[in-house]
A protein has these predicted regions:
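Alpha-helical transmembrane segments and membrane-interface helix-loop junctions
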Residues: 1-78, 82-185, 540, 588
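Alpha-helical transmembrane segments of multi-pass membrane transport proteins
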Residues: 115-117, 154-731
Length: 731
């Protein structure tokens, strides 16, 4: 009977989490529809949305704790039984006590943090915030009761509750003071001596807590616990922690994180990956390194949308490794390529780390995305170069280009290909400019065909149109001239001819017919450009980041469930069950790491660090080199979301002192952390790849070393050539 009740509770908990996650797309979507078709807005939709993010975070955190999937940095340290079992229990008790302290402070904040009559819709805000209390309380209990290795969990729950109550005692006093007048006398008597105890015990507890991360303590407990104990040490209000969590989670742009994450999981769980691989393989397998290029592009695509390199390695690693191994690539090369490619998409829109950095640094997220495009391409091209060089040196077999195969693959994957373009057009608002330039190009080419070539036969006309039109349009976009001059047109036409000659050279080497092969590449680009233009002309929508995320999620859901029918409605729960640990885990970390960021800033640590660095380091370039090294080390030990919240605030003032563009600093930050994922001994991608390919971490590290060097070169170029980041910022 007990197990049945527990299963019902778990099912209800999961269902509420799934519903809240799906519902995040509703309010942005309604806002878009109301604004563009009815010229109005949905009343207080942003308020509903951000508080729904709050609910999703803590419901997701509860589900994540039940699944034991909160992010950890657990190492296999040489500790033998029975000490290992004892250490495990002590770590779980410590984590539970810290989480119970969070619950006490959240309760005090919920009761006293807002005006009594404040509501979100018809729900009083203080009752809505009880989801924070419920979330922390549930996660704390599961540290004890959710562990099979703990016997008599009820016995261990008692010291966890007592220690958590001592750590959060000042919040307990605030709970009673706010809800029923003055606190009971015994609480007032205990407050002063317990505060003295916490002042003395905070430092050793912080040391123990930091060490516990190597024995399985979740990262959110360690980051939040360190901040909490630092505030307790200074006798500061402990309600700062839930206040900062609330502030972070109710920031408007944060809603894009769960929406894009769910979009990525919807894509990775059906046959979208297979279709994209088939499409890229049909287009690129005819030239040296084509299959490696396919793997890199697919990895970049999925990492961009999931925001987590681990998801790409785990979801796509098996299929991509099979294709590469059977395509003639060695096992060592394949593992190294896929491990290193797992994070190269993190600089492209709509990457979640870029969003979080922009929000944290208070920089335009759109500018961050613009700044990341060329550096991201540098990383991708570096990886592609490695693939091509390997294929040439090892004489990897190429495949003749098949027009029908490419056309079929394009038709099958068109819906997946269109999604990033729709996001790009909606968010960056390039539609109107593109239409003008495309029209000029079409007229120019028709005049060229009819008056100069004097041949208006359909086959050649279409061939010329489909071949050069989109490429010339691309050149116009790069020149970014509102009214293209004849000089610009001439340069664009020359570039088009050079492109055609290059493709013809490769195709001729394979013995292929240029006339039958060339148009397929151009038709692909032309069709995509045409659909993009049609979208821009008919809809004329300019979307916010969150609205773009909502449209992407709804679009993907419709494609995969209604049109493709790869996913059944009943299968959505499985997809969301895999997505929630990322959403709940990441947002929980962000909410608590924001408290640590607040402490660092409030204590003037960035100012002090800036003064010290400025006194020791006088050269901008030496500072940048040291920054690269520090961030690579940080990337080894901290996942990217924690690093952004904890480390980024420390470097903002340093960047200002040395005159570094804020967007450039952000791209350096993210690119260096990416490199840390590949750095031994505990780079995240190395650990995940070891798990996915069933190989020792040492062997994975050796396989990845050459790619690590290539990405190091790319990171140095990004660091010391700021034009790569700033070139597109003014466009």
């Amino acid at each position: 009977m007990e197990n049945k009740v527990l299963r019902l509770i778990h099912a209800g908990e999961s269902s509420l989490a799934y519903l809240s996650l799906l519902s995040l797309a509703v309010f942005p979507f309604l806002d878009v529809m109301a604004r563009h078709f009815f010229h109005t807005d949905v009343n207080n939709s942003n308020g509903y949305l951000v508080h729904l993010v709050l609910v999703t975070t803590f419901l997701g955190g509860m589900v994540t704790s039940r699944q034991k999937k909160h992010l950890t940095l657990s190492l296999e340290l040489p500790v033998k039984e029975p000490f290992q079992a004892i250490l495990y229990i002590l770590v779980q008790v410590l984590c539970a006590s810290i989480t119970f302290a969070f619950a006490w402070s959240s309760l005090a904040f919920s009761l006293n943090g807002f005006e009594p009559g404040k509501k979100i819709g018809i729900v009083p805000l203080k009752w809505l915030l009880m989801v924070m209390v419920l979330g922390y309380l549930t996660m704390g209990i599961r540290f004890i009761f959710g562990q099979e290795r703990i016997e008599r969990p009820g016995l261990w729950l008692i010291p966890a509750v007592l220690l958590g109550s001592v750590i959060g005692f000042s919040s307990i006093v605030q709970v009673f003071a706010g809800s029923a007048g003055p606190p009971p006398a015994f609480l007032a008597v205990l407050q002063a001596p317990l505060q003295t105890v916490m002042t003395q015990a905070a430092t050793p507890l912080i040391i123990v807590l930091v060490l516990s991360v190597f024995f399985g303590s979740p990262i959110f407990v360690v980051l939040g616990g360190v901040a909490y104990l630092l505030f307790a040490h200074q006798a500061a209000p402990l309600e700062i922690m839930p206040n900062q969590a609330y502030t972070m989670l109710t920031g408007y742009s944060i809603a894009a994180i769960p929406l894009f994450a769910l979009t990525g999981f919807l894509l990775s769980e059906d046959k979208a990956g297979e279709r994209l691989i088939k499409f890229f393989r049909a287009l690129f397998s005819w030239f040296p390194g084509g299959l490696a290029v396919v793997a890199i592009l697919v990895c970049a695509f999925f990492t961009t949308f999931t925001g987590a390199s681990g998801v790409t390695i785990l979801a796509m690693g098996g299929l991509l490794s099979y294709i590469l191994l059977h395509g003639g690539y060695g096992k060592t090369f394949t593992i190294g390529l896929l491990t290193a490619s797992g994070s190269i998409g993190l600089l492209f829109p709509p990457s979640l780390p870029v969003i979080i950095y922009g929000v944290t640094a208070q920089i335009s997220v759109k500018e961050m995305f613009k700044g990341g495009i060329l550096p991201g391409l540098a990383l991708v091209l570096g990886m592609m170069t490695m693939g091509i060089v390997y294929a040439v040196r090892n004489d990897v077999e190429r495949h003749r280009f098949q027009f029908r195969e490419a056309l079929t693959a394009f038709r099958e994957s068109i819906w997946e290909i269109l999604m990033p373009l729709i996001i790009f057009v909606g968010y960056f608002g390039v539609g109107a400019v593109l239409v003008k330039r495309f029209a000029v190009v079409v007229v120019f080419l028709l005049v060229l065909e009819v008056l100069i070539c004097r041949e208006s036969g359909t086959p050649k006309l279409l061939n010329l149109f489909f071949t050069f039109t989109p490429i010339t349009a691309l050149f116009f976009l790069l020149f970014h001239s509102p009214s293209p001059s004849w000089i610009v047109i001439g340069i664009a036409a020359a570039g088009s001819a050079a492109y055609g000659f290059l493709i013809a050279y490769f195709m001729d080497g394979l013995g292929a017919d240029f006339r039958s092969v060339m148009p397929v590449f151009a038709r692909f680009i032309a069709l995509v450009a045409g659909l993009l233009i049609l979208f821009a002309v008919t809809v004329k929508i300019s979307l916010t980041l969150v609205e773009s995320a909502a449209i992407a999620m709804i679009y993907t859901l419709i494609i995969q469930v209604v049109i493709r029918r790869d996913l059944k409605i009943r299968d959505l729960s499985k997809v969301m069950s895999k997505c929630l640990p990322i959403v709940g885990g990441v947002l929980t970390i962000l909410s608590l790491a924001n408290g640590l960021s607040y402490y660092l800033i409030d204590s003037d640590i960035p100012v002090k660090l800036t003064a010290w660095v400025h006194a020791v380091v006088s050269s901008k370039y030496v500072f940048l080199l040291l920054l690269n090294l520090v961030l690579i080390v940080v990337g080894c030990f901290l996942e990217i979301y924690s690093a952004i919240l904890v480390v980024a605030p420390l470097i903002f003032p340093l960047g200002h002192v040395f005159g570094i563009n804020p967007v450039h600093l952000g791209i350096i930050f993210l690119a260096s952390l990416e490199l840390g994922y590949l750095t031994p001994p505990v780079g995240l991608n190395l650990l995940l790849s070891s798990y996915r390919f069933n190989e020792p971490v040492v062997k994975v590290a050796k396989s990845t070393f050459k790619f690590l060097l290539i990405q190091l070169v790319a990171v140095l170029l990004i660091t010391y050539l700021p034009i790569l980041t700033t070139l597109l910022l003014k466009k």
